[in-house]
Amino acid sequence: MLFRSIPSTMLGYKKDLPDYDYDPQKAKALLKQAGLEQGAEVTLWSMPVQRPYNPNSKRIAEMIQNDWAKVGVKAKIVSYEWGEYLAGMRKGEHDSALYGWMSDNGDPDNFAGTLLSCDNIQTGSNAARWCDKSYDALVKKALLVSDPQARAKLYEQAQEIFYQQAPWITLATGKTFYATRSNVSGYTVSMMGSDFSKAKLN
């Protein structure tokens, strides 16, 4: 269940949204509706680096390319040096691209706002360059609310809009594993980094 604007571990994750259907015929109909009955040609940017959420960008790009070809979208896979790739994404030079994010602070706004707010089109962190005023209002309101349950409801409403509009498709989430020896105690794994202040060797 990846079709959300925030990860399942965060406040406000909406569990009850159904998966998108696999429907090539509907995809063709939508292309026709957009005036692209004869198909389309696009570039698909593939990251030149491995990331926890995307260890093989080239292979994933090839799989997408293959699926899109079935509905008449011809994708040319391109890649650039990582710095150039990031700069191009921020400027909106891509037609479509593989991209990802890892939370800086564990707050849902670090996904819902940082990656999708209208304001962040200009900063470049909204790589989808999507702006929905209703979504934006919910996310901005959530920043001003201190009650966790009230915040969660606002993010859930925002995710419904995200789900309907689909400014991006979440393909995968990464899992990071930490191992400790049996003689280590007091070490707690944290999404915000490693804290060894209470760790001991027994």
List PLM regions with ranges.
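Extracytoplasmic/secreted envelope proteins and their assembly/folding machinery
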Residues: F3, P24-L31, K58-A61, Q65, ...
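Short, solvent-exposed loop/beta-turn-alpha elements that line the ligand-binding surface or hinge
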Residues: L11-K26, L36, G88-G92, G113-L144, ...
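Hydrophobic aliphatic residue packing
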Residues: I64, V71-V73, A179, V184
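Bilobed periplasmic-binding protein-like "clamshell/Venus-flytrap" ligand-binding domains
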Residues: R4, A34-P52, E93, A97-W101, ...
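Append "and occasionally in soluble cytosolic enzymes with long acidic Gly/Pro-rich linkers
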Residues: M1-N66, K70, L138, Q157, ...
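Periplasmic binding protein-like
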Residues: L44, N66-N120, L154
